[in-house]
């Protein structure tokens, strides 16, 4: 049990490192691709990268299990697809807003603003599900935000429209995390991720196609 907890915490730390590096690449991409085009390509590539693992896990019949080892009702059919769509909408909203903001906003400041979702998660959990958070967690959140501010912000702090878009994305990502916390005991994570990534990419597809067609028209003119 302790080993599983340690490995889970290590996985979360690794996710945080990858998440932080992500802003640098997103900033570079925002200078060459529109937000919807980037999101569509990004999540379709995510689906392609997950498919080999998905089929491998499916062959092995490796199903996620709770630490207690108790059988939990798994969602299939309509409930699974509705949960996937809900998570996809929250993820898509956050991804698009942060990509729009990064077109102008500084990557380090965007990373700091985006990290504010760690405070929104327990707040929304309390408001939506009446789940209380311990004082130690709130102290940890405050320390994390102060630390991230000192790490990311060096020349003062001001907000503009692009920063506001990134701030709005934190609400979407906080909702996304809450959805995952509620859905994860009832769904197999890998198929859920594949469907979520596919839906997120597809939601951006029509807009990105329209944008590319408009760009081609401008080039011909």
Describe each model-derived feature in a short phrase.
Residues 22-23, 51-114, 150:
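Specific transmembrane alpha-helical segments of multi-pass solute transporters/efflux pumps
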Residues 1-39, 156-182:
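Glycine-/small-residue-enriched transmembrane alpha-helix faces in small-molecule transporters
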Residues 50, 133-153, 170-173, 204:
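Hydrophobic transmembrane alpha-helices of multi-pass small-molecule transport proteins
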Residues 49-57, 117-139:
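C-terminal transmembrane-helix exit sites in multi-pass transporters
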Residues 18-33, 39-41, 45, 93-105, ...:
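Juxtamembrane C-cap of transmembrane helices in multi-pass membrane transport proteins
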Residues 210-217:
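Conserved small/polar residues in nucleotide/adenosyl-binding loops
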Residues 84, 133-144, 188-196:
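Cytoplasmic-side transmembrane-helix entry/capping segments in multi-pass membrane proteins
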């Amino acid at each position: 049990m302790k080993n599983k907890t340690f490995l889970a915490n290590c996985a979360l730390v690794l996710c945080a490192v990858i998440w932080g590096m992500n802003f640098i690449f997103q900033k570079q991409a925002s200078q060459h691709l529109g937000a919807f085009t980037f999101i569509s390509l990004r999540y379709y590539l995510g689906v392609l990268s997950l498919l080999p693992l998905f089929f491998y896990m499916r062959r092995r019949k490796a199903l996620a299990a709770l630490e207690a080892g108790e059988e939990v009702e798994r969602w299939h059919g309509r409930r699974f697809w509705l949960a996937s769509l809900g998570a996809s909408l929250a993820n898509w909203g956050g991804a698009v807003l942060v990509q729009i903001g990064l077109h102008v906003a500084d990557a380090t400041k965007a990373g700091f603003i985006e990290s504010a979702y760690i405070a929104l998660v327990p707040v929304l959990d309390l408001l939506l599900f009446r789940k209380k958070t311990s004082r130690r967690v709130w102290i940890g959140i405050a320390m994390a935000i102060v630390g991230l501010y000192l790490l990311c912000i060096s020349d003062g702090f001001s907000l503009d429209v692009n920063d506001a878009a990134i701030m709005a994305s934190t609400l979407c990502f906080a909702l996304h995390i809450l959805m995952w916390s509620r859905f994860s005991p009832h769904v197999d994570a890998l198929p859920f991720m594949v469907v979520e990534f596919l839906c997120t990419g597809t939601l951006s597809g029509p807009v990105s196609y329209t944008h590319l067609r408009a760009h081609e028209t401008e080039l011909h003119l």
